[in-house]
């Protein structure tokens, strides 16, 4: 009998996307091929505590479960030891948001010399920062929404022109979006059309990050595609999102099973538009050096222009998440998708072992 691969499934975390991570972890655990993998859940509570494996299993069964015996992680050695767990062959992090998909957790895995699913350190950090993603996308000719960035020190200077709605509107128009540069799932994002809304949106966004982006509003329909793999990635088809409320795709729209947003897979679009969405996704995936997986989001304008909005290098695996749905439509069912993601992480690790790290 082939020995099963021991998977450390890490979920939760001190993040604004904690609930999404719990649901994603639950779904991955239910769908993973139990004939190939033994799963060892590692639950990080929203307060930053590590729960026991027993309690981690409980929250996978019931996402509302509260930890009874948390272990506060005071230093890195406590995490690296991962006491009371068997030897982990590969980690599957599904910790969304800050510390989970920004390169921090990935760096820890590198220190531990363990394979892991998803982006390596550089790509995780670059795609978490929306401004860096835009700069890299422009490098390969992929259109992005025009923007300005505001750092914390600029926000603290109340005479800074970037805080003046009318002056910013001269560049971006009066219809804008304000968003934290290093958050996902529309957390802290607001649509503004006047000075009062602008001031309130900046205050809200700076609760989540020390850098905030102000973007022009790009009219149109949100379209998404999904990418799987390392050096020769597979790009899935294209999905289309329609929000019945007539507003942008909010955190609740993305993850609530009762969301009013409608997901159409495949999108009812001309083939040339589909080809552009997919080719742009491939270009962005490669220039950001993504590996494993990513969901690439864009806006399709009324005149047929495809404008990149976000690279989500650790997409959700909730009941309504677009990433697994797009690959299911492409002929890769949920269980096989998880297997391929794990294999991609292990393949990258095996390759890195062949590289020299010192001069002979």
Swiss-Prot record:
Cofactor(s) of this protein: Mg(2+); Mn(2+)
Gene Ontology MF terms: ATP binding; D-alanine-D-alanine ligase activity; metal ion binding
Binding residue positions for Mg(2+) 2: 310, 312
Organism per entry: Lactobacillus acidophilus (strain ATCC 700396 / NCK56 / N2 / NCFM)
Gene3D superfamilies (alphabetical): 3.40.50.20, ATP-grasp fold, A domain, ATP-grasp fold, B domain
Keywords recorded for this protein, A-Z: ATP-binding, Cell shape, Cell wall biogenesis/degradation, Cytoplasm, Ligase, Magnesium, Manganese, Metal-binding, Nucleotide-binding, Peptidoglycan synthesis
NCBIfam families for the chain: D_ala_D_alaTIGR (TIGR01205), PRK01966.1-4 (NF002528)
Class of this enzyme: ligase
Name assigned to this protein: D-alanine--D-alanine ligase
Record GO cellular component, one term: cytosol
Binding site for ATP: 169-224
Documented EC number(s): 6.3.2.4
Keyword Magnesium attached: yes
UniProt subcellular location: Cytoplasm
Binding of Mg(2+) 1, residues: 297, 310
Main location: cytoplasm
């Amino acid at each position: 009998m082939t020995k099963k691969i021991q998977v450390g499934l890490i979920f939760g975390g001190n993040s604004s996307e904690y609930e999404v991570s719990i649901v994603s972890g639950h779904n991955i655990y239910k769908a993973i091929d139990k004939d190939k993998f033994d799963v060892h859940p590692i639950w990080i509570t929203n307060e930053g505590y590590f729960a026991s494996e027993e309690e981690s299993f409980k929250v996978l069964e019931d996402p509302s479960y509260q930890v009874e015996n948390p272990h506060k992680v005071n230093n890195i050695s406590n995490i690296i030891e991962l006491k009371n767990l068997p030897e982990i062959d590969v980690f599957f992090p599904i910790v969304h948001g800050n510390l989970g998909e920004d390169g921090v957790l990935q760096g820890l895995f590198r220190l531990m010399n363990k394979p892991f699913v998803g982006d390596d350190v550089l790509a995780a950090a670059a795609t978490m920062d929306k401004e860096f993603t835009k700069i890299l996308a422009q490098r390969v000719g992929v259109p992005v929404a025009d923007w300005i960035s505001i750092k914390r020190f600029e926000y603290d200077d109340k005479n800074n022109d970037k805080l003046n709605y009318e002056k910013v509107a001269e560049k971006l128009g009066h219809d804008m979006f304000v968003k934290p540069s290093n958050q996902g799932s529309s957390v802290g994002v607001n649509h503004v059309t006047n000075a009062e809304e602008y001031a309130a949106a900046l205050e809200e966004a700076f609760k989540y990050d020390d850098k905030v982006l102000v973007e022009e509003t790009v009219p149109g329909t949100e379209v998404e595609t999904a990418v799987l793999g390392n050096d020769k990635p597979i790009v899935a088809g294209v999905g289309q999102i329609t929000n019945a409320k007539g507003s942008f795709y909010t955190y609740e729209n993305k993850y609530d099973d009762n969301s009013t947003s409608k997901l159409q897979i495949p999108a009812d679009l001309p083939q040339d538009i589909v080809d552009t969405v997919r080719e742009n996704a491939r270009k962005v995936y490669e220039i950001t050096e993504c590996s494993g997986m990513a969901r690439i989001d864009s806006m399709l304008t009324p005149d047929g222009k495809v404008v990149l909005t976000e690279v989500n290098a650790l997409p959700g695996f909730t009941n309504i998440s677009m990433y697994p749905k797009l690959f299911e439509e492409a002929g890769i069912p949920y269980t096989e998708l998880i297997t391929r993601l794990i294999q991609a992480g292990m393949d990258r690790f095996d390759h890195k072992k062949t590289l020299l790290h010192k001069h002979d």
